[in-house]
Amino acid sequence: MRLRYIYAVLLCVLLAANVEAQVYIDSTEVARILGRQPAQTAIVQEYTVEDGEGEDDTGIPEFQTDARLSWKENIKARLDGILQGSLVETTQVGVMVWDLTDDCSLYSYRERMQMRPASTMKCVTAIAALDRLGSDYNFRTNIYCTGDSVDSTGVLKGDIYCVGGMDPMIGAGDISAIADSIKAMGVRIINGSIYADLSFKDRDRLGNGWCWDDKNPTLTPLLYGKRDEFTTRLRSRLREMGISLSGGAGERTLPGNAKLIVTRTHGIAEVMRPMMKQSDNLYAEAMFYQIGAAEGCRWSSAKQSATYINGLIRKVGLTPNNYNIADGSGLSLYNYVSPELEVQLLRYAFKNRNIYDTLIETLPIAGVDGTLKSRMRGTAAANNVRAKTGTVMGVSSLAGYLTASNGHQLCFAIIINGGMRNGPMRSLQNRICVALSQ
């Protein structure tokens, strides 16, 4: 009687506990369902999920492997168990895993559901940019001058034109190098103004579907330290070097008779690294607009870039009308993709080494760097998973590559919409990655 009372008390405590539980069904249960053995008691692994989990995942238990099942069946058993928890009941979850070695689907769960991707949208942008522009592409900022040659007294009777190419990496070193090039012409006085040519992209300073009260990047073709301060900084640097200007600063389109002074460049891989490793939204938008500009039009727009991406979606065998590409960073509320789309683009990249070799070097590495530095540490996924994270209010996602225990190369996408806490959503993603890695 006393023993029953103790059991009752313990049950009440467990029911009152404010936790979420994910339940794993062991592979032996799958074998029973497949009819390979008599009914047995399934081994159930219970794992408590607290808010904020995912920052340190040393507590993720090892997954059991049933020798009677194939590798693929063991993977299915593990992922089916992970996806039986309460989080899946209260949110929208989509998962797809592709075996790149055998070139076939390994696992799928609501993989065609249209969902907001958050920053895994940057994978779409990166792959499309490398496909359209190539791995040798450079972001360019060109500086021109008008007027005759500098006279014997060091006077330039003309204007300086700064033609922006939406390079987010322009910094103090670039401004100094530009000023040095102007001084090297023998210029001491500029009888003219400094103009910004902003015709690289349209006039939209914010992306379509961005929340006005968020901390959003400013979308301008001429940047300095991520700010719209290029011409101001150049004027200041010229004055510091003893070069005076008689005119002011403004915006004007480059005239046809202007002469090139200097070009500052940054390579696509150089820009893509912070875009992916640190999930920099401005860098992603700059990358996105390069795609549209590559079509040969001035005033590049998000629509032009999306048109190219829609063509790529068609190229990988999917229907563009099933998705909506609104921006390059994933900030827009109007982006809608699916795990299947992200996986098929990752698969396409893997098959094209000119894309993959650059992309794989820019993705965060679990437990090592970027936005995955503090995730999956001490697990089989650490230093193995290379993937892009995604987080906005109510959305958490993860998409990338890993190597399975049998040596197979895999790509995957996990998108969760509707969750109110990041911890449980990230924890589910982490456990899937560990299950695939073990």
Put a short name on every predicted segment:
Residues M1-S27:
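Bacterial Sec-dependent N-terminal signal peptides
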Residues D26, A31-T101, Y107-E111, I178-A184, ...:
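Beta-lactamase-like hydrolase cores
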Residues P61-S70, S108-P117, I160-I170, A179, ...:
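Second-shell loop/turn segments in exported
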Residues V88-Q92, R110-R112, A118-M121, D136-N138, ...:
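Extracytoplasmic
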Residues D103, P117-S135, I194, R233-L238, ...:
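Active-site SXXK
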Residues S135-D202, W210-P217, Y224:
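Active-site-adjacent, His/Asp/Glu-enriched structural segments that form or flank metal-binding
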Residues G225-I360:
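A small/polar active-site loop signature that marks catalytic segments
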Residues N324-Q438:
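C-terminal soluble interaction/assembly domains
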